[in-house]
Amino acid sequence: MNETMICAVGNVATTPVFRDLANGPSVRFRLAVTARYWDREKNAWTDGHTNFFTVWANRQLATNASGSLAVGDPVVVQGRLKVRTDVREGQSRTSADIDAVAIGHDLARGTAAFRRTARTEASTSPPRPEPNWEVPAGGTPGEPVPEQRPDPVPVG
């Protein structure tokens, strides 16, 4: 399937609106993306045009974004670009939306402290042993190998 995937770097422009819908959590917010360029005449960085996107996130990404983002936060958003045109009150309007697959704080402009979320669903499959991708003598690549630990060294 051909989709337009983009990565937008900007600032959260509106308070994220969280909704718990029948098919799972959803959040939306506006993202302001302003081009900056070096103005040689002024010898300074200058703001260019600002584009606004409505960012949509679903499921766990929605829950985490809602609890992590605030107006003004610098963020990086990756997702599918959707340009929509509709008619409201007799006027044709165009909007650019991003269906987000990843959202994060822009660490080029600040720091963050990451916290993992607790898993809400129990895993239905038993854990599988990690395959050893190095081939043991006489073995086959990709087969799990029993864990090999060195013999303990006596102390003292």
From Swiss-Prot:
The gene is ssb1. The keyword Lipoprotein does not apply. Residues 114-156 are annotated as: Disordered. Homotetramer. Keywords: DNA-binding. Residues 114-124 have a biased composition (Low complexity). GO terms for biological process: DNA replication. Gene3D superfamilies: Nucleic acid-binding proteins (2.40.50.140). One of its GO terms (molecular function) is single-stranded DNA binding. It comes from Streptomyces coelicolor (strain ATCC BAA-471 / A3(2) / M145). This is Single-stranded DNA-binding protein 1. Residues 1-107 form the SSB domain. Pfam families: SSB (PF00436). One of its GO terms (cellular component) is nucleoid. CDD domains: SSB_OBF.
